[in-house]
């Protein structure tokens, strides 16, 4: 699929990213604690599942306009998930000497996100 630089595509990414970033911020406010960043973990795992689901649905509908994929995947899911926050939280745990917690968080985030991306793809295929 070729990318077209049109104002609608910019707007789709911007609106999607703003909504995704706000959802991530709210999840952090509601769920993060000093002991464990549950909000970040949740949005990264949910994002893994949702991107798998979205990609499968979008691949099944190549006739859909480009802005839908840009708003949903590049915008919303790009704004929702965060590798930089995950990295900062993991390094913070390491700096506090919480090595086992940091390792568990990193492993759960990585393996969980990969597994949920695969589950999202499988879910979309099962619904066809």
From Swiss-Prot:
Keyword entries, A-Z: Cell inner membrane, Cell membrane, Ion channel, Ion transport, Membrane, Metal-binding, Sodium, Transmembrane, Transmembrane helix, Transport
Catalytic activity, reaction form: fluoride(in) = fluoride(out)
Activity regulation, per record: Na(+) is not transported, but it plays an essential structural role and its presence is essential for fluoride channel function.
GO cellular component terms, semicolon-separated: plasma membrane
GO BP terms, alphabetized: cellular detoxification of fluoride
Positions of disulphide bridges: none
Cellular localization per UniProt: Cell inner membrane
Keyword Ion transport found: yes
Keyword Methyltransferase: no
Residues the record lists as binding Na(+): 78, 81
Membrane topology classification: Multi-pass membrane protein
TM region positions: 10-30, 40-60, 71-91, 102-122
GO molecular function: fluoride channel activity; metal ion binding
InterPro entries for this protein: FluC (IPR003691)
Matching Pfam families: CRCB
Function: Fluoride-specific ion channel. Important for reducing fluoride concentration in the cell, thus reducing its toxicity.
Family membership: Belongs to the fluoride channel Fluc/FEX (TC 1.A.43) family.
PANTHER family referenced in this protein's UniProt entry, alphabetically: FLUORIDE EXPORT PROTEIN 1-RELATED
The protein's name: Fluoride-specific ion channel FluC
The organism of origin for this protein: Bordetella petrii (strain ATCC BAA-461 / DSM 12804 / CCUG 43448)
Gene that encodes the chain: fluC
């Amino acid at each position: 699929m070729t990318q077209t630089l049109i104002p609608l595509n910019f707007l789709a990414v911007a609106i999607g990213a703003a909504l995704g970033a706000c959802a991530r911020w709210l999840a952090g406010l509601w769920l993060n604690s000093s002991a464990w960043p549950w909000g970040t973990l949740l949005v990264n795992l949910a994002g893994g599942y949702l991107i798998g689901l979205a990609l499968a649905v979008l691949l099944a509908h190549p006739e859909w306009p480009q802005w839908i994929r840009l708003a949903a995947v590049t915008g919303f899911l790009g704004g929702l998930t965060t590798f930089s926050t995950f990295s900062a939280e993991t390094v913070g745990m390491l700096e506090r000497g919480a090595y086992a917690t940091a390792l568990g968080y990193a492993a759960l985030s990585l393996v969980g996100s990969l597994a949920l991306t695969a589950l999202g793809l499988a879910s979309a295929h099962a619904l066809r």
